[in-house]
Amino acid sequence: MTCDDVETVKPRVAAVVVTYHPDEDVQMHLAALRPQVDQLIVVDNGSSDAAVEKLRRQGEELGFELIANGENLGVATALNRGAQRALETCAEWIFFFDQDSCVTDGFTAKMLAGYDSVAARRPLGILVPRYVDRQSGNPHPVMRLPDGSLITAITSGSLMRAGTFRELGSFADELFIDSVDHEYSFRVRRSGRILAECESAVLFHSLGMPKPHSLLGVFRFQSTNHSPVRRYYQERNKIWMYRHYGLAFPAFFAQEFLRSFVDLAKLELVEREKWAKTKAFFRGVADGLRNRMGRCL
């Protein structure tokens, strides 16, 4: 039986949410999202038994499907498992979400309308919402090309046609975490499609907790304070990405490598765990050059 054979019962809009040691806020995020989609698929990446059981109970109450991986398989694999389930159940549209993202009223309806509006004029691959930091209330700046389309797209809150995902393939499992969204964005752009923003659809999203600093009372800057593990995957995956997309998108990678060295300097100046983070940074570089991929830490 194909999806065409079950036209009358197929869920039109599916959402995939990846969880990892979810807190109480995640339950509210899922409750806000569930009424806005036909099918909600939650993929848990190795949370505690108690957390998984809580998700299971909530799934029974709200009517969503839980896929419990049992261990941390990485964000790419988790997204792929959720997307595959959506394809199996004949979804036409797929939303992807992080656990710390919360939809606003009418979010999915605005995104679907926005997608159709853009796609009527240009070949569209991914549509993202307007991201607002839930702590500060500030919008997240986006990087645009001269034609107004986006350079890359954040995965959380993004919308794709199921057919586009089927054509372009799964997220890159070998990246494990970090750069997963950049990689897929470049794959979309290389296919001749664009990335666009729907400004009317607002998604409250955690944009990190950068810490402000002042050097000599004059130079003001922010440090990212990423963990050693995050540092490792950032640098390793950046090299893998350059190997695959550097010639096609040289300006992006020039900026990314410059940012790496600036972040390393900030790390040495003001962050804690300097030695652990520095070791992770250079180990990531070394493993990237050796093409040692997958889960390594």
Model-derived segments and their meaning:
Residues 17-36:
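Short, well-formed alpha-helical segments that are part of the catalytic scaffolds
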Residues 164, 168-169, 174-207:
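A short, conserved alpha-helix in the catalytic core of glycosyltransferases
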Residues 105-139:
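Conserved donor NDP-sugar-binding/catalytic core segment of glycosyltransferases
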Residues 242-297:
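Non-catalytic, C-terminal membrane-associated alpha-helical segments of glycosyltransferases
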Residues 91-102:
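Short beta-strand-to-loop acidic/aromatic patch adjacent to the donor-nucleotide binding site
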Residues 143-160, 223-226:
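A recurrent flexible, glycine/aromatic-enriched loop bordering the glycosyltransferase active site
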Residues 44-53, 71, 101-102:
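A conserved acidic beta->alpha catalytic loop
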Residues 69-88:
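Glycine-rich, basic loop-to-helix element that forms the pyrophosphate-binding segment
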